Amino acid sequence: MKLTCVVIVAVLLLTACQLLTADDSRGTQKHRALRSDTKLSMSTRCKGKGASCSRTMYNCCTGSCNRGKCG
């Protein structure tokens, strides 16, 4: 019985901590574009800086294609 009460209290405490930290971290991601570009380069096969590219086929890791070159 005591063990059950301790487990219930521990679960309630952990849940409260999760809810508090979730509220504090809302909207604090500052560099979303940088993070998404990093994920893009890690999850897909993309071309590095200076490689040839076309505007119709978005495949540059840097995210920009200028004058036929990834920039």
From Swiss-Prot:
The Cysteine amide modification is found at: C70
Q: Where this protein primarily resides, as one coarse class?
A: secreted
Domain-level remarks: The presence of a 'disulfide through disulfide knot' structurally defines this protein as a knottin. The cysteine framework is VI/VII (C-C-CC-C-C).
Tissue spec. comment: Expressed by the venom duct.
Species for this entry: Conus achatinus
Q: Which residues form the propeptide?
A: 23-45
Q: Which InterPro entries match?
A: Conotoxin, Conotoxin_omega-typ_CS
Protein name listed in UniProt:
Omega-conotoxin-like Ac6.4
Write down any Gene Ontology CC term: host cell presynaptic membrane
The record lists its disulfide bonds as: C46-C61, C53-C65, C60-C70
Q: Where is it localised?
A: Secreted
Classification from the root reads: Eukaryota, Metazoa, Spiralia, Lophotrochozoa, Mollusca
Q: Where does the record locate the signal sequence feature?
A: 1-22
According to its UniProt entry, the function of this protein is described as: Omega-conotoxins act at presynaptic membranes, they bind and block voltage-gated calcium channels (Cav).
Q: Which GO terms describe its molecular function?
A: calcium channel regulator activity; ion channel inhibitor activity; toxin activity
Family, as annotated: Belongs to the conotoxin O1 superfamily.
Tell me which domain of life the UniProt entry assigns to the organism this sequence originates from.
Answer: Eukaryota
Keywords in UniProt for this one?
A: Amidation, Calcium channel impairing toxin, Disulfide bond, Ion channel impairing toxin, Knottin, Neurotoxin, Presynaptic neurotoxin, Secreted, Signal, Toxin, Voltage-gated calcium channel impairing toxin
